[in-house]
From Swiss-Prot:
NAD(+) binds at G228, S229, Y230, A231, T232, G233. It comes from Legionella pneumophila (strain Corby). This is N-succinylglutamate 5-semialdehyde dehydrogenase. Catalyzes the NAD-dependent reduction of succinylglutamate semialdehyde into succinylglutamate. Its EC number is 1.2.1.71. It holds the Pfam family Aldedh. It comes from the Bacteria. Gene3D superfamilies: Aldehyde Dehydrogenase, Chain A, domain 1, Aldehyde Dehydrogenase, Chain A, domain 2. Belongs to the aldehyde dehydrogenase family. AstD subfamily. Signal peptide: none annotated.
Length: 495
């Protein structure tokens, strides 16, 4: 990529305007080539404080805007995304390394999220009224106020959108800090909001690294919506330990299990396992990290075909031909981190079946890896965010469930099995927020809640249930005319 193709940042988006930043240089690169893609600035403390100020100033008017009017703005946003569909998909692929086919599905998810969010708000936070003998019992919902959305790099448009849209529909104003790996995607998304006619100050975008994020969280805010690693989520939780009035919605990934039962269609099991482990270069929080297979002929045959399919998998830049199944991990630094994690597992007794290897220097391109950890001693309960699968063998189904539950996390879990009774046993005993049967662990629907238990979250599921953490309930007993009760309580004399 030549220097002429480098995207120069529009700046920070504050109060409906792009303001050229004055902070330290911030850059994003194409992880498939290592070349510079976007250049801008970290938000300064003053810019962050100013964004918070204008979000507060815009709050009252926005919160008092009718739901129908707020929904109209979100639909106008969808129209802008539709107009920029091809550009947005290409930008996602350039900045994350995803194949173009996958980026196109992400753009479709962004578009589809709005109507689902409107429906969810109307179902979960719509006003209700019940008449009693003495008064009207009313339930209404109010926005929290100014909420911070911290974006993730793996779905830079869709995951942030899954917080922003419900927050705006509920009447909150938003301070959005995208992942420092995907600032260009964020700028285009914010431009779509700008072109929708959204009032100034309702959404503000601040680019920056973790230090900018910390400064942002120290402001006068009422909510934080985060998708990312457990380590970062834990730090956010600790940062707000003395501010219980701030609502936190934390989605923090997992060390997800996929159990392979005795199945007739081995190829189907291999296919769904690949979609569970390797899609998005293993960079989905619902990716299966641990594949639990029977210690039998079925298990041997499955593992042989799984390894062969991973070895033959096409990996490369999004514009490669023929089209790849996966691209790189998000950066060269992360690729080296994952390779180091693989080395540590080998030192613990893991047996390499297919080594994960760096395919091109100075990039995030790595090949899929498979390691058998059955005989390893005390394997770490950590999420390796890469195309890398750990194999564990079991002798009976009860043992498979026991192995699956050996994690402090609890986001997703899956079972590939022709046995309905085994699925019922699996479902009843597995502790996870998403439990799939004969579907990839990465399979999820925006019409359902999305979240985990344990160290995977703090019981604030997103997707269809995002409306729940974007507004708080207000219960009211109301009577239009002040009257004295006919029957008064004993012991009171009114003259």
């Amino acid at each position: 990529m030549s220097k002429l193709q480098i995207i120069q940042s529009k700046g920070q988006y504050i109060n409906g305007e792009w303001i050229k930043g004055n902070g330290l240089i911030l850059e994003s690169t194409n992880p498939a080539s290592g070349t510079l893609l976007w250049q801008g600035n970290n938000a300064t403390d003053e810019e962050i404080a100013n964004a918070c100020y204008v979000a507060h100033r815009a709050l009252k008017s926005w919160a008092n805007t009718s739901f129908e009017e707020r929904a109209r703005y979100t639909k106008a946003f969808v129209e802008q995304v539709e107009k920029n569909r091809e550009q947005l998909a290409r930008l996602i692929s350039l900045e994350t390394g995803k194949p173009l086919w996958e980026s196109q599905t992400e753009v479709s998810s962004v578009i589809g999220k709005v109507n689902l969010s409107i429906q969810a708000y109307q179902e979960r936070t719509w006003p209700k009224q019940t008449e009693t003998a003495e008064a009207n019992a009313c339930l209404r919902f109010k926005p929290h106020g100014i909420v911070v959305v911290l974006g993730a790099f793996n779905f830079p448009a869709h995951l942030s959108n899954g917080h922003i849209v419900p927050a705006l529909l509920a009447g909150n104003t938003v301070l959005y800090k995208p992942s420092e790996h995907t600032p260009a995607v964020a700028e285009l998304i914010i431009q779509c909001w700008h072109d929708s006619g959204l009032p100034p100050g309702v959404i503000n975008c601040l680019q920056g690294n973790a230090n900018c994020g910390n400064t942002l969280l120290s402001q006068d805010i009422q909510g934080v919506y985060f998708t990312g690693s457990y380590a970062t989520g834990l730090r956010i939780h600790q940062q707000f330990c003395n501010r219980p009035e701030v609502i936190l919605a934390l989605e923090m990934g997992g060390n997800n299990p996929l159990v392979i039962d005795e199945v007739k269609d081995i190829d189907a099991a291999v296919y769904h396992t690949i979609l569970s482990t390797m899609i998005t270069a293993g960079q989905r929080c619902t990716c299966a990290r641990r594949i639990i297979i029977p210690d039998s002929q079925t298990g041997d045959l499955f593992l042989e075909r799984f390894a062969k399919a991973c070895k033959l998998m096409r990996i490369g830049s999004f514009d490669s031909q023929p089209e790849p199944f996966i691209g790189p991990v998000i950066s060269h630094v992360q690729a080296l981190k994952h390779l180091h994690a693989q080395k540590q597992l080998i030192e613990m007794g893991g047996e390499i079946i297919l080594p994960m290897s760096l395919l091109l220097e100075y990039t995030g391109l790595v090949s899929p890896g498979i390691i058998d950890m059955t005989r390893a001693k005390n394997p770490p309960d950590e999420e390796i965010f890469a195309p890398f699968a750990q194999i564990y063998r079991y002798n009976h189904f009860d043992e498979a469930i026991q192995l699956a539950n050996q994690t402090r996390y609890g986001l997703s879990a899956g079972l590939l099995s022709d046995n309905k009774d085994h699925y019922q046993q699996f479902y009843q005993n597995i502790r996870a927020g998403l439990i799939n049967w004969n579907r990839p662990t990465t399979g999820a629907a925006s019409s359902l809640p999305f979240g985990g238990v344990g160290c995977s979250g703090n019981h604030r599921p997103s997707a269809y249930f995002a409306a729940d953490y974007c507004a708080y309930p207000v219960a009211s007993m109301e009577q239009p005319l002040l009257t004295t009760p006919v029957q008064r309580l004993p012991g009171l004399v009114l003259e």
